[in-house]
Curated annotation (Swiss-Prot):
S-S bridge residues: C4-C18, C11-C24, C17-C35, C21-C44, C26-C33
Function as written in the Swiss-Prot or TrEMBL entry: Potent toxin that may paralyze and/or kill insect pests such as H.virescens (lepidoptera), S.exigua (beet armyworm) and M.sexta (tobacco hornworm).
Domain note: The presence of a 'disulfide through disulfide knot' structurally defines this protein as a knottin.
Keywords (A to Z) from UniProt: Disulfide bond, Knottin, Neurotoxin, Secreted, Toxin
Subcellular location(s) of the protein: Secreted
Family: Belongs to the neurotoxin 02 (plectoxin) family. 02 (plectoxin) subfamily.
Keyword Disulfide bond carried by entry: yes
Protein name, as recorded: U1-plectoxin-Pt1f
Annotated tissue distribution: Expressed by the venom gland.
One GO CC term, this protein: extracellular region
GO MF annotations, alphabetized: ion channel inhibitor activity; signaling receptor binding; toxin activity
InterPro entries listed in its UniProt record: Agouti_dom_sf, Spidertoxin
């Protein structure tokens, strides 16, 4: 799983995206995070 550094965007206002997702995308500075593939038990949505 990819881990972001710095600030992480929340998913649905709940958990940090990269903490609850199998994969995420970051910008070049690692200051933004977006779910690509949520875990089955995660409340993140891609």
């Amino acid at each position: 799983a990819v881990k972001c550094i710095g600030w992480q965007e929340t998913c649905n206002g709940k958990l940090p995206c990269c903490d609850g997702c199998v994969m995420c995308e970051c910008n070049i500075m690692g200051q933004n995070c977006r779910c690509n593939h949520p875990k089955a038990t995660s409340e993140c949505e891609s």
